Swiss-Prot record:
Class of enzymatic activity (EC top level): hydrolase
Entry GO MF terms: magnesium ion binding; RNA nuclease activity
Function: Toxic component of a type II toxin-antitoxin (TA) system. An RNase. Its cognate antitoxin is VapB2.
Family annotation (PANTHER family): RIBONUCLEASE VAPC6 (PTHR39677:SF4)
Lineage: Archaea, Methanobacteriati, Methanobacteriota, Methanomada group, Methanococci
Name listed for the protein in its UniProt record: Ribonuclease VapC2
Domain PINc: 11-149
Originating species: Methanocaldococcus jannaschii (strain ATCC 43067 / DSM 2661 / JAL-1 / JCM 10045 / NBRC 100440)
Record CDD domains: PIN_MjVapC2-VapC6_like
InterPro entries, sorted: PIN-like_dom_sf (IPR029060), PIN_dom (IPR002716), VapC_family (IPR022907)
UniProt record similarity statement: Belongs to the PINc/VapC protein family.
């Protein structure tokens, strides 16, 4: 097995990979293990964190967004340790004003929704050219290589 160069093993992880991992999907678990074992350097950003937390909160409470907003005390009883432990194995990349500017052109050029555009612009800003995702929308982005599972 050939060793990867540093730039080859830098991979951005989309929210759906982390969500599928939390749901027990084997393919996602294998990828997460590679990050844990430091075979690949995994990156996420605040968009991914927000999406994963929102999914996890809805899934564990079995409540809709509106119900949680109406009864925020529901959040007190949640155990979020498993989610934050998952986040801890990744390098968390900050968003900044330049990334926001880049996202504007990415929305237009690749016809992406804002969160996906912010993910792509994060990759572009930090010079990460690989993304791991189950989302086919990223296939439209010519500067990203989709890591197939």
């Amino acid at each position: 097995m050939r060793r990867l160069k540093m730039e080859e093993n830098k991979i951005f992880f989309d929210s759906n990979i982390l969500i599928y991992h939390l749901c027990g999907k084997v393919e996602a678990k294998k990828l997460i293990e590679k990050v844990e074992n430091k075979e690949i350097c995994g990156f996420i950003n605040p968009i991914v964190i927000s999406e994963v937390l929102f999914f996890y909160i809805r899934a564990t409470t079995n409540k809709r967004h509106y119900d949680i907003k109406k009864h925020p005390e529901i959040l007190k009883s949640l155990d979020l340790d498993i989610v934050f432990e998952l986040f801890s194995i990744f390098q968390i990349l900050d968003l900044n004003s330049e990334i926001v500017k880049i996202s504007r052109e990415i929305i237009k050029k690749y016809c992406l929704l804002p969160n996906d555009a912010l993910i792509c612009s994060t990759c572009k800003f930090y010079k990460i050219n690989k993304i791991c995702s189950f989302d086919d929308d990223f296939k439209r982005v010519d500067f990203l290589e989709i890591i197939e599972i």
